[in-house]
């Protein structure tokens, strides 16, 4: 019947009989009188078909129930007079030229559990749903949305209307978690990033606005100095180029408290300074925010896949790179050191970033902690898929859903992805 619905839907104004003929699945169907009621559609009158269509399928007239008792029926079967049933279907024929061979002798044939959609669904080990997505949102001080050239389909959202509209779209398809990233005016940037903890800054204002409109929305925030730093680094830079660790952590604590005070549900230190999780936890608790969670960027690698993100926020380092504080892409075991530290310091969620190039690290964390794992499908991963799809090199929907499924399969509980709304729409459509 799915074929019936698709054929009819693809032929505007068609009669159902035309659709049935077109799809060749009209066996067992008969014309019905033009009576409209639940599940009945006239085959003679043109119609606009709804998304779901129930067409009456009638084979033979249903026989009246037999007056015989259950005991009589059972006795007939025992006596060898079993009632007639449809014959066993003939085995489908192989194409001409197929060699005639004896079946392979093998007790285990894994394909048996894959032979139908129902069996595949029954034994599916990993699932994804909109509840698994966190939508990253870029915000700026302007009133209008501004497209991001390196991230087709993504925009810097005007902090009032654009932000609200995007969250409406997300919630409409079941995505109720967002993370905010600010594009800060250059005039507000400084070497110490003091704007990061301004209670009336862009992020605190966005948090208050969203909580006023959507009290149950889960708001994650980014805790780092790079959007606010005139140097473009995640920490305070000494004159010799060294990123100062402890002084930076002091600033991050004030930033996290300001975000929590505005109403953030989860603060997310992405800076990769040593000891920042424990210091932020202590600062939050002392400020009365014991219920605000920390999502630690535990294994954040110094990756080439961040390029489009830095364009979106204009947060490229003014000199050097971030290799003295972000992890070496060649390292695997080092992620366990960061995991144990963050867990001991009070992290509530552990993150791996990027996601797809580091599926092995996601699995490593999953096997070594009971805490929830998040993974960030970063801007470079997003833009790669979009570019390949635009060039006709792959099917965007299939590639996106497969990539997200692989991240979940590796062990991530939640995924930060720019595809959140689109993927949720696809998933919802599949369940209709």
Swiss-Prot record:
Keywords: Allosteric enzyme, Chlorophyll biosynthesis, Chloroplast, Heme biosynthesis, Lyase, Magnesium, Metal-binding, Plastid, Porphyrin biosynthesis, Transit peptide. Residues 84-113 are annotated as: Disordered. It is an enzyme of class 4 (lyase). Gene3D superfamilies: Aldolase class I. It is found in: Plastid, Chloroplast. It comes from the Eukaryota. 5-aminolevulinate 2 binds at residues 379, 418. Its cofactor is Mg(2+). PROSITE patterns: D_ALA_DEHYDRATASE. The active site is at residues 300, 353. 5-aminolevulinate 1 binds at residues 310, 322. Binds 2 magnesium ions per monomer. The first magnesium ion is required for catalysis. The second functions as allosteric activator. GO terms for cellular component: chloroplast; cytosol. Mg(2+) binds at residue 338. One of its GO terms (biological process) is heme biosynthetic process. Its main location: plastid. Pathway: Porphyrin-containing compound metabolism; protoporphyrin-IX biosynthesis; coproporphyrinogen-III from 5-aminolevulinate: step 1/4. Homooctamer. Catalyzes an early step in the biosynthesis of tetrapyrroles. Binds two molecules of 5-aminolevulinate per subunit, each at a distinct site, and catalyzes their condensation to form porphobilinogen. This is Delta-aminolevulinic acid dehydratase, chloroplastic. It comes from Physcomitrium patens (Spreading-leaved earth moss).
């Amino acid at each position: 019947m799915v074929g019936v619905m698709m054929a009819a839907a693809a032929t505007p104004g068609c009669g159902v009989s035309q659709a049935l003929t077109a799809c060749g699945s009209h066996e067992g169907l008969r014309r019905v009188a033009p009576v409209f009621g639940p599940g009945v559609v006239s085959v003679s009158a043109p119609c606009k078909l709804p998304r779901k269509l129930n067409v009456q399928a009638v084979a033979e007239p249903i026989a009246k129930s037999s007056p015989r008792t259950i005991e009589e029926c059972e006795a007939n079967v025992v006596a060898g007079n079993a009632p007639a049933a449809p014959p066993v279907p003939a085995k489908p024929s192989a194409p001409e030229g197929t060699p005639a061979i004896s079946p392979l002798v093998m007790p285990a044939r894994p394909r048996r559990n894959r032979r139908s959609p129902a069996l595949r669904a029954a034994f599916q080990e990993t699932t994804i749903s909109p509840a698994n997505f966190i939508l990253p949102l870029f915000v700026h001080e302007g009133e209008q949305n501004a497209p991001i050239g390196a991230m087709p389909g993504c925009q810097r959202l005007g902090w009032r209307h654009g932000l609200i509209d995007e969250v409406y779209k997300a919630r409409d398809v079941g995505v109720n978690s967002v993370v905010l990233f600010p594009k800060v005016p250059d005039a507000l940037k400084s070497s110490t990033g003091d704007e990061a903890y301004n209670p009336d800054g862009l992020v605190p204002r966005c948090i208050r606005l969203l909580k006023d409109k959507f009290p149950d929305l889960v708001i994650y925030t980014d805790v780092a100095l790079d959007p606010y730093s005139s140097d473009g680094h995640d920490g305070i830079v000494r004159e010799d180029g060294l990123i100062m660790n402890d002084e930076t952590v002091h600033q991050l604590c004030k930033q996290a408290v300001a975000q929590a005070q505005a109403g953030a549900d989860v603060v997310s230190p992405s800076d990769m300074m040593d000891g920042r999780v424990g210091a932020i936890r202590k600062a939050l608790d002392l400020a009365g925010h014991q219920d605000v969670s920390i999502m630690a960027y535990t294994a954040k690698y110094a990756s080439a896949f961040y390029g489009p993100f830095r364009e979106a926020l204009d947060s490229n380092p003014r000199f050097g790179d971030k290799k003295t504080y972000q992890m070496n892409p060649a390292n695997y075991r080092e992620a366990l050191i960061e995991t144990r530290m963050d867990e001991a310091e009070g992290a509530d969620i552990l993150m791996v970033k990027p996601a797809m190039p580091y599926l092995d690290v996601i699995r490593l964390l999953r096997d070594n902690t009971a805490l929830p794992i998040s993974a960030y499908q970063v801007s470079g991963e997003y833009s790669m898929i979009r570019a390949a799809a635009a060039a006709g090199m792959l099917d965007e929907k299939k590639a996106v859903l497969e990539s997200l499924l692989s991240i979940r399969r590796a062990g991530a509980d939640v995924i930060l992805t720019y595809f959140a709304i689109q993927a949720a729409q696809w998933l919802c459509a599949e369940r209709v």
